[in-house]
C-alpha cells in the first residue's frame, strides 16, 4: 500500500450539488429557487431584510457616536520598552521618539504619536520624546532616572482668531 493508493471510504465525503444541470439531476430548471419572485431572480437579496418584520438593526437602540476630534495614539507600555532594551533592539543613548519605538516594533499605527503607559517595570534611564504619557508612566520614568518630553500645545485656530481680535481692539 502506498500513500497515493489510499482513498476515502465510499460516502465519507458527500459531493457538492451542481444546480441547474437538467431535470435528471433533481436540482435542474429552477435550481431549488422555486417559482418566480425576487428570490428566484439573479442578484443578491436585500441584506438585513427580515420579510417585513422589524429588522434587528432597527430593533436595537442607537448608541454612541464617532468623535471626529478623537486622538489616535499608539499605546506603549513601559514593561515592553524595557524588554526591547534588554534584547538590544532599542538604542537609549539618545532620545527615544515615535520613530525609534516604531523601528523596535513597539508602536503600531498611532497617527497622532505615542502615549506611554505605566504597565510593567522600567529600570533603564531613558529620555523619551512622545505625544503623551500617563501619570504613572511619568513617575516610573523619573524614578528610573529618565525624562519625558511632551510637545508644546499649539493654539487652535479659534484661539489665534481671538488673540487677533484682542490685538485689533487695543489699536
Swiss-Prot record:
It comes from the Bacteria. It holds the Pfam family Ribosomal_L27A. Binds to the 23S rRNA. Part of the 50S ribosomal subunit. One of its GO terms (cellular component) is cytosolic large ribosomal subunit. GO terms for biological process: translation. Residues 157-171 have a biased composition (Basic and acidic residues). GO terms for molecular function: rRNA binding; structural constituent of ribosome. The lineage of its organism: Bacteria, Pseudomonadati, Pseudomonadota, Alphaproteobacteria, Sphingomonadales. Belongs to the universal ribosomal protein uL15 family. InterPro entries: Ribosomal_uL15, Ribosomal_uL15/eL18, Ribosomal_uL15/eL18_sf, Ribosomal_uL15_bac-type, Ribosomal_uL15_CS. Residues 1-44, 150-171 are annotated as: Disordered. NCBIfam families: rplO_bact. The gene is rplO. This is Large ribosomal subunit protein uL15. Keywords: Ribonucleoprotein, Ribosomal protein, RNA-binding, rRNA-binding. Residues 21-35 have a biased composition (Gly residues). Gene3D superfamilies: 3.100.10.10. Residues 1-10 have a biased composition (Polar residues).
Amino acid at each position: 500500500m502506498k500513500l497515493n493508493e489510499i482513498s476515502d471510504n465510499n460516502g465519507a465525503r458527500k459531493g457538492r450539488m451542481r444546480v441547474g444541470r437538467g431535470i435528471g439531476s433533481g436540482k435542474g430548471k429552477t435550481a431549488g429557487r422555486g417559482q418566480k419572485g425576487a428570490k428566484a431572480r439573479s442578484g443578491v437579496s436585500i441584506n438585513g431584510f427580515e420579510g417585513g418584520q422589524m429588522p434587528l438593526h432597527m430593533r436595537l437602540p442607537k448608541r454612541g457616536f464617532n468623535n471626529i476630534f478623537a486622538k489616535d495614539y499608539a499605546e506603549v507600555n513601559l514593561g515592553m520598552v524595557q524588554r526591547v532594551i534588554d534584547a538590544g533592539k532599542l538604542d537609549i543613548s539618545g532620545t527615544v521618539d515615535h520613530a525609534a519605538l516604531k523601528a523596535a516594533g513597539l508602536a503600531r499605527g498611532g497617527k497622532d504619536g505615542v502615549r506611554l503607559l505605566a504597565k510593567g517595570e522600567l529600570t533603564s534611564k531613558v529620555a523619551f520624546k512622545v505625544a503623551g504619557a500617563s501619570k504613572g508612566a511619568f513617575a516610573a520614568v523619573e524614578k528610573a532616572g529618565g525624562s519625558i518630553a511632551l510637545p508644546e500645545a499649539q493654539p487652535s485656530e479659534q484661539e489665534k482668531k481671538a488673540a487677533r481680535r484682542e490685538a485689533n481692539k487695543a489699536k
